[in-house]
Swiss-Prot record:
Record keywords, A-Z: Amino-acid biosynthesis, Isomerase, Magnesium, Metal-binding, Methionine biosynthesis
Record EC number: 5.3.2.5
One of the record's GO molecular function terms: ribulose-bisphosphate carboxylase activity
Protein name: 2,3-diketo-5-methylthiopentyl-1-phosphate enolase
Organism: Bacillus cereus (strain AH187)
């Protein structure tokens, strides 16, 4: 294979999956085949999409009810020749799912890139090992927290929040994805002030914390804004990838003048991936494609919290981010939304040690503030790695957190 193989979930009311698959393969490549003269067929053969797999699935009554008709469901795979498209994500996505996405009854499940095609994508600049080296933390999951309630607040408020989270033992603090350029907390001022706070905490407590600042602005201003952030001392760039496009992420990741990790936020991605019947699968969108395009971290809904993904999907995202690949470094999985210390054993059991535990309210809502919230999470992480039940841990901050949010992992064994 020198091109790309697309895997689709299709629904067909004519009950002929093979015919529908062939129609898709032709419609997204040469348009027609049987009515072409033999000589023209020979000329176009190398450009034709080829159906390589058709698998019928069991009938699903909920699907029939939703679509208001009886359909045959199936998984199909089509190989698209590399000759047909330039080696970039806009061309690949348009080839494999462009007008097909308008069908409303087809879901793009996966894209399998040939080795030749993979060479055109950067992958993470730092990856898991590189991030761990920045923090000098190699033996446990990382802990991340989020600035909360920053809109309308000044730099002083930001510095106080940042200091408390860092003292609490948080490894990474990220901006809220809805904090954009503004007069009270402009980009470079956030970075400079944040570094002063984090350096002070490091000198006093010996704990290193990185700050992920939100990269925003018009698309053609992003590189300039990113370089300003780097010059000001930015540790990590948070980026709302799907508000801009995967190719924009790749452009940032490939730029040698932006030598910092990039954290991909999933904002807007639900518009592409939420349906079980159409769109793009979450594992492909938030896992494989983000990694290929250069994200060092991928945030996605956890299976446990307030905006939950099905566990199978969340684990598939993580698999794509972390599986061995000779072409790409591994990206950090960041299962998010509604996470509190009682979920830590679940997260470690399901995602392993190479994960970022991301909390907002679970840190800021602690009765001892963000310092107490961070310490509660760190105690939960340490106990989990020792296979010690959380309720047996002699830590006042963790005990308080479990009283507030509960301990659903009471029976979890690693």
């Amino acid at each position: 294979m020198s091109g790309i193989i697309a895997t689709y979930l299709i629904h067909d009311d004519s009950h002929n999956l093979e015919k529908k698959a062939e129609q898709i393969a032709l419609g997204l490549t040469i348009g027609s085949w049987t009515h072409l003269p033999h000589l023209l067929q020979e000329q176009l053969k190398q450009h034709k999409g080829n159906v390589i797999h058709v698998e019928e699935l069991a009938e699903h009554e909920h699907t029939n009810s939703y679509l208001r008709k009886k359909v045959k469901r199936g998984i199909i795979k089509i190989e698209y020749p590399l000759l047909n498209f330039s080696p970039d994500l806009p061309a690949i996505l348009t080839t494999t799912f462009g007008k097909l996405s308008l069908d409303g009854e087809v879901k793009l499940i996966d894209l399998t890139f040939s080795d030749e095609l993979k060479k055109h994508f950067p992958g993470p600049k730092f990856g898991i090992d590189g991030i761990r080296n920045l923090l000098q933390v190699h033996d446990r999951p990382l802990l991340m927290s989020i600035f909360k309630g920053m809109i309308g607040r000044n730099i002083g408020y930001l510095k106080t929040q940042l200091r408390d989270q860092a003292i609490g033992g948080v490894d990474i603090v990220k901006d809220d994805e809805i904090l954009f350029e503004n007069a009270l907390t402009p980009l470079t001022k956030r970075i400079v002030s944040g570094k002063e706070v984090l350096q002070s905490v490091y000198e006093t407590y010996g704990h290193k914390t990185l700050y992920a600042v939100n990269l925003t602005g018009r698309t053609f201003d992003l590189k300039e804004n990113a370089k300003r952030a780097v010059q000001a001392g930015a540790d990590i760039l948070l980026f709302n990838v799907f508000s801009y496009g995967l190719d924009v992420l790749q452009s940032l990741a490939e730029d040698d003048e932006i030598p910092v990790p990039i954290m991909a936020h999933p904002a807007v991605s639900g518009a592409y991936s939420a349906s079980k019947l159409y769109g793009v699968s979450s594992p492909l969108l938030l896992g494989k494609l983000l990694r290929y395009a250069g994200a060092d971290f991928s945030l996605f809904p956890s299976p446990y919290g307030s905006v939950a993904l099905e566990k199978e999907e969340a684990l598939a995202i993580s698999k794509y981010l972390t599986e061995d690949d000779a072409f790409f470094k591994k990206s950090f999985s960041v299962p998010s939304a509604g996470i509190h210390p009682g979920f830590v054993p679940f997260i470690v059991r399901d995602f392993g040690k190479d994960v970022v535990i991301n909390a907002g309210g679970g840190i800021h809502g602690h009765p001892n503030g963000a310092q107490g919230g961070g310490k509660a999470f760190r105690a939960a992480i340490d106990a989990t790695l020792q296979n010690k039940p959380l309720h047996e841990v002699d830590d006042i901050n963790l005990h308080s957190a479990l009283q507030i949010w509960g301990n659903p992992s009471h029976e979890v064994k690693l």
